[in-house]
Amino acid sequence: MVRIYCKNTGTYKEFLEGTPLLDIAPQFEFDKPYEILAAKVNNVAEGLRFRVFHNRDVEFLDYRTYIGRNFYSRSLCFLLYKATRDLFPESRMTIRRPISKGYFCSVYKNDGSFLTEEDVEVIGARMRELVDENIPFKRKELQIEEAIKIFKESGDLDKVKLLETCGEVYITCYSLGDVTDYYYDELVPSTGYLKTFGVKLCHGGILLRVPDRHHPEDLAPLHEEPKTFEVFAETHKWNWIMGLSNVGDVNESILKGNASDLIQISEALQEKKIVQIAEEIERRHNDPDNPVKLVLITGPSSSGKSTVCKRLSVQLKACGLHPISFSTDDYFVNRVDTPKLPDGSYDFDNFDTVDHEYLQKDLVKLLNGEEVEVPEYNFVTGRREFNGKNLKLGERSVLLIEGLHALNPRLTEKVPDKEKFRIFINTITSISLDCHNCIPTSDNRLLRRIVRDYLKGAFTARESIANWPNVRRAEVKWIYPFQENADVLFNSAYLVEFAVLRTHAERILATVPKNCPEYSEAHRLLKFLHYFVPVSDKEIPPTSLLRGFIGGGSY
């Protein structure tokens, strides 16, 4: 017998050795408003078919959890692949990236044509049939050579390259009916779990819609992101030109000794984009009918806002402009007036953390050519101070505001739109592990943050992981709603950044204790990083955006 401690109930029960989690879950009585999809066993994510042979702590998870959503979405991608293969046997499907609160998938039929509305409807109907049939996702361990042979025969060369460079002896594959596929993490037990989904024709492919994270019985509301898709398409085009569509391609190139070239290309592409932005700002600044005086820069945590802002300042100077940095931090309300969260802690991400009325008053004066004494925030006392710091804009001056709320219209509502230039910085990862395993868009930002926080002595890896859900909630509420308002989106994703981050992050993630809740995420990230051939950071230049996270930068 094995003794199971259920964290959901705080109680123990005994079961026969080898009992699967699928049979254990119903024996514990707790509120289950939604179907159980996964579990954490000793703080490691496991599928419900996992069999328990030793005493363990178990926490059962539904769709409202990050792990539950990942299991569901991954399984849904396999369901889509199976339906597409059933209807269009010679087609090629690629799960490109999360977008518009779903997943964009490209599908190329054997005649080279794109999907039609009718095709998508038929695929959706076939997916429904497969759900109704409740077919199990069968898990099997294969020797790496056996798996490579299977995927060579099916023409999945992207998987072949990934498996040839991952260094594993055995891997876990899944089959759904007559289709075998590889996923880098677990799936739900069967298709019957996947009741809520939608498919929609999107840019010649499919937008796979997933449930709402708070109300899994409903689809997540559709949120169009045309500018984000445009940036993704541009980055994907460059990757295609270089022959680097997935991690296997990148690993193969690194193993051939091309890491230095990949670093230089990544740097050149980012600098080219910064130059283009600077030149557009100069053009707008010189336009008497559209005179840009204020540049607003924002983006989610660890997107590289500060470094991009500094590099943009250099290029603006090269254009003959005089950039002046203007920090919203200096306009924080006094700490005693800071909004609070329900638990009583300070909500530093709240829009009202900034005294936006006072900030706008100074902005209007500055943009009208007046001299203004600006405050400086004392983070020790938690109060604004005036220390004789005066600002005045000259004829060639441009004011740069970089901050969490920079694109929130309320922050600069008294400034005419024609005087603003809005930049949104994000990490839009365009390579995938393989054609059916896209990389979560927030993983590189989380890894950047973990490494930076640790190297600067600000937080341990455990603390950074623990705080990440709060960071993400703030981004969803305060930052992403204004992404499509930007004049330009800058993609700060770096072609070999996971390979570089691996050399720093592995030892840092290894410090997370196994007996804490954050271990499950540390374990997942370590497993994920193992797919990348490591690259030394010695050739990353001091001005690189990555240096802001791994250290050794000149800014």
Segment roles from a protein language model:
Residues 50-69, 83, 92-100, 104-272, ...:
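Auxiliary tRNA-acceptor-end handling modules of aminoacyl-tRNA synthetases
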Residues 285, 409, 413-555:
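Conserved NTP phosphate-binding and transfer environment spanning the P-loop NTPase/kinase superfamily
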Residues 295-297:
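Hydrophobic anchor at the beta1->P-loop junction of P-loop NTPases
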Residues 308, 312:
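Hydrophobic positions on the alpha1 helix immediately C-terminal to the Walker A/P-loop
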Residues 318-336:
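Short beta-strand-centered segment that lines the nucleotide-binding/catalytic pocket of NTP-utilizing
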Residues 333, 337-380:
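Conserved nucleotide-sensing/catalytic segment adjacent to the nucleotide-binding pocket
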Residues 360-417, 468-482:
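Glycine-rich phosphate-binding loop used to anchor ATP phosphates in small-molecule kinases
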